[in-house]
Curated annotation (Swiss-Prot):
GO cellular component: nucleus
Region (Disordered): 1-33
Cited InterPro entries: MAGE (IPR037445), MAGE_WH1 (IPR041898), MAGE_WH2 (IPR041899), MHD_dom (IPR002190)
Composition-biased stretches (Basic and acidic residues): 11-21
Keyword Transferase: no
UniProt keyword Transmembrane helix present: no
Highest taxon listed in the record's lineage: Eukaryota
Compositional bias segments (type: Low complexity): 23-33
Tissues where the protein occurs: Expressed in testis. Not expressed in other normal tissues, but is expressed in tumors of different histological origins.
Ranges where the MAGE domain occurs: 40-239
The name this protein goes by in its record: Melanoma-associated antigen B5
Source organism of the structure: Homo sapiens (Human)
Gene Ontology BP terms: negative regulation of transcription by RNA polymerase II
Keywords: Tumor antigen
Amino acid sequence: MTSAGVFNAGSDERANSRDEEYPCSSEVSPSTESSCSNFINIKVGLLEQFLLYKFKMKQRILKEDMLKIVNPRYQNQFAEIHRRASEHIEVVFAVDLKEVNPTCHLYDLVSKLKLPNNGRIHVGKVLPKTGLLMTFLVVIFLKGNCANKEDTWKFLDMMQIYDGKKYYIYGEPRKLITQDFVRLTYLEYHQVPCSYPAHYQFLWGPRAYTETSKMKVLEYLAKVNDIAPGAFSSQYEEALQDEEESPSQRCSRNWHYCSGQDCLRAKFSSFSQPY
């Protein structure tokens, strides 16, 4: 799926013309299954682009409009196409497609976190930044609740998000992460205690503890990887324990734990340096 997510009227016409080439019929054969799979993939991608365009333009999302994109003749496949498109948008952008008015079948893409402007942060016709923030929270959790700057930038490199470059969705990543996410208190970014020379690390901020939890973040990671949350056994146990505490208790405990561990590591490192 392209990040731009731009839809135009011509796309619907071209896709509908391809329906004749890739029909899903009741006849079962290898060629029919392949054609049906191709058809569904095309429609999933088209519906994703349509939904992201509606989000970007802050326009209403109606079921009847989604059916038009898929083509009303293929209502039998609509449920699967709708599910796959919404799930893919969820794992990429961390927004959920929700029916906000069942009477008129009105839908909206809702950010998993309460970032300003429904995940956009800044005013304008832009796409949500929630996916990058959720990914950062995952990395911090997997790194023992505090992740050093070098590890986080290496992870972003793996996602082909590079420091110093400007991106259509995220703008300048360093500014978004170290300024916007920190200013909104979803992340904390500060010098590692007792470190010399100075090293810097990321922790969850108070707002992250209030609006989400380790279990929810782990469930998001599991969905991205299409596995059960329990597959991350040690993190799953930690997430279960955290469910019994308040957000402020979790925030305080993890901050003190990371500070103590980092100070010990820094002292050990200084003793091990050759003279």
